[in-house]
Each structure stands twice: as structure tokens, then as C-alpha cells.
């Protein structure tokens, strides 16, 4: 359903769960392992060349502020969908996602969507399986 596409925040919930387990001295994995599970591990499983930071690769990077994980990640609300007469459930967690780079271009900078996102070429590409 188009209304339910953007409200679960699984990656943020996983990172918070891991951080909470570390803070309670009962680590289920390291933070590095958690990030790997959501990036390189999944890329390997799907057979795509992604999920790693290497010289010469696309720069697909998300910069998070780990001190902002103290908020409720489960709070959802309704928001209007641009260009549609619909609303959708969203989960906004201010302060956590600082920057998002897609192919080296800022899609989010200082927690704000950039105006170039979706209008300029180079913000992404189809990733073929190996």
C-alpha cells in the first residue's frame, strides 16, 4: 500500500537496538557489524557491487548522529504526498540523519533535502547483479 511505504525505519531501529545492547554491556554485535549487516552483507547477498567505501566506487553514504538515538523511533504521523491527493504514514526522527550522499552528490545536507535531488542526473543508477 502506498500509504505504508515510509514509516518503519528498520535501519535506525536496528542501530538503536545494537547501541542499547552495547550500553547495557550485553552487546548483540558491534556497531561496525550492524552497519555491515545493512550494507555490504546485503549487497553481497544480492550480488551487487555496493555496500563498501572504496576508492573509485560510487559514494553512497549516510552520515548519522549516534547521540540522537535517544528519541522514540516508533512515533509515526500522517503526511501529505507531493503530487498526489493522498497521505502516507511517515516516521521522522529529527537529528539522526545528517547527510545522505548518492553517487557522491548530496541528497540530504544538514538534515535538509537538496533541491538537486531527483532533478539532476547522477543521483543513482540501476545496480546489476554480478
Give a label for each model feature.
Residues 1-71:
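His/Asp/Glu-enriched, well-ordered alpha-helical/loop segment
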Residues 63-119:
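C-terminal cap of metal-dependent C-N hydrolases
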Residues 15, 19-22, 26, 47, ...:
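Residue-level detector of solvent-exposed, low-hydrophobicity positions
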Residues 10-11, 117-126:
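Cofactor-binding beta-sheet edge motifs in enzyme active sites
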Residues 26-33, 87-95, 126:
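Glycine-rich, flexible loop segments associated with nucleotide phosphate handling
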Residues 51, 98-99, 106, 125-130:
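Ligand-binding pocket scaffold of soluble enzyme catalytic domains
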Amino acid at each position: 500500500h502506498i500509504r505504508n511505504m515510509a514509516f518503519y525505519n528498520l535501519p535506525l531501529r536496528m542501530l538503536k537496538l545494537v547501541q542499547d545492547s552495547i550500553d547495557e554491556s550485553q552487546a548483540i554485535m558491534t556497531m561496525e557489524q550492524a552497519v555491515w549487516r545493512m550494507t555490504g552483507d546485503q549487497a553481497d547477498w544480492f550480488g551487487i557491487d555496493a555496500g563498501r567505501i572504496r576508492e573509485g566506487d560510487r559514494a553512497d553514504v549516510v552520515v548519522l548522529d549516534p547521540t540522537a538515538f535517544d528519541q522514540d523511533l516508533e512515533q509515526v504521523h500522517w503526511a501529505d504526498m507531493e503530487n498526489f491527493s493522498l497521505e502516507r504514514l511517515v516516521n521522522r526522527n529529527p537529528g539522526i540523519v545528517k547527510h545522505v550522499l548518492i553517487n557522491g552528490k548530496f541528497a540530504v545536507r544538514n538534515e535538509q533535502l537538496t533541491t538537486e535531488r531527483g532533478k539532476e542526473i547522477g543521483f543513482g543508477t540501476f545496480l546489476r547483479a554480478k
